[in-house]
């Protein structure tokens, strides 16, 4: 289990303090502007030797390992099958590795339109077809275009810091960059477990200090009805 003082947050204020205390480069800011639009990370930035040099001698292990995935918008049109262009970026298992990776990838406001950035538990692919995700669903929060950076970071911290009471139900999260808005979704395992899904949705809103209603859609419905799928739960 992660060391308690490393990532411990029950409110937006606590998460903000976590950012200030643990992020070796503060809040991220403009340091990543040198990357080209739509690019996730330079070839050298995530070299294992560079990451190792940035990690302190006494790392703080997370309860689960997590993998960042990226779906490049420029590659989507070249793929006939949905999800074929999604590729893993890096798997991390400590707090220090998380910040090393997070500080070397574009945040949502810097990503190109139609880009998708995922963070899922290791060995779970961010696809409906993955056996762990197949019977699940997702909660979604909408943000104005370019305004989801903090929401994305707070979501990541809550997930990897095991802040959800029903955290075992969580597969991962994704931020979708679209024209006019950004969407952040949390994917879960068992959509029919209404109590667990409601718990996750309510706690997520608390972590984000988000007051509007949010909805939960079954993956099975999303596959059948696409954008016309209706919410099964709301909080």
From Swiss-Prot:
InterPro entries, per database record: TIF_eIF4e-like, TIF_eIF_4E, TIF_eIF_4E_CS
Region (EIF4G-binding): 60-63, 70-106, 154-163
Pfam families linked to this entry: IF4E (PF01652)
Modification note: According to the redox status, the Cys-133-Cys-171 disulfide bridge may have a role in regulating protein function by affecting its ability to bind capped mRNA.
Polar residues composition-biased segments: 8-24
Disulfide-linked positions: 133-171
Keywords per UniProt: Cytoplasm, Disulfide bond, Host-virus interaction, Initiation factor, Nucleus, Plant defense, Protein biosynthesis, RNA-binding, Translation regulation
Region described as Disordered: 1-36
Assembly description: EIF4F is a multi-subunit complex, the composition of which varies with external and internal environmental conditions. It is composed of at least EIF4A, EIF4E and EIF4G. EIF4E is also known to interact with other partners. In higher plants two isoforms of EIF4F have been identified, named isoform EIF4F and isoform EIF(iso)4F. Isoform EIF4F has subunits p220 and p26, whereas isoform EIF(iso)4F has subunits p82 and p28. (Microbial infection) Interacts with potyvirus viral genome-linked protein (VPg); this interaction is possible in susceptible hosts but impaired in resistant plants.
Family: Belongs to the eukaryotic initiation factor 4E family.
Miscellaneous comment text of the record: Displayed sequence is cv. New Hampshire Midget and confers susceptibility to zucchini yellow mosaic virus (ZYMV).
Purpose of the protein: Component of the protein complex eIF4F, which is involved in the recognition of the mRNA cap, ATP-dependent unwinding of 5'-terminal secondary structure and recruitment of mRNA to the ribosome. Recognizes and binds the 7-methylguanosine-containing mRNA cap during an early step in the initiation of protein synthesis and facilitates ribosome binding by inducing the unwinding of the mRNAs secondary structures. Key component of recessive resistance to potyviruses. (Microbial infection) Susceptibility host factor required for viral infection by recruiting viral RNAs to the host ribosomal complex via an interaction with viral genome-linked protein (VPg).
This protein's name: Eukaryotic translation initiation factor 4E-1
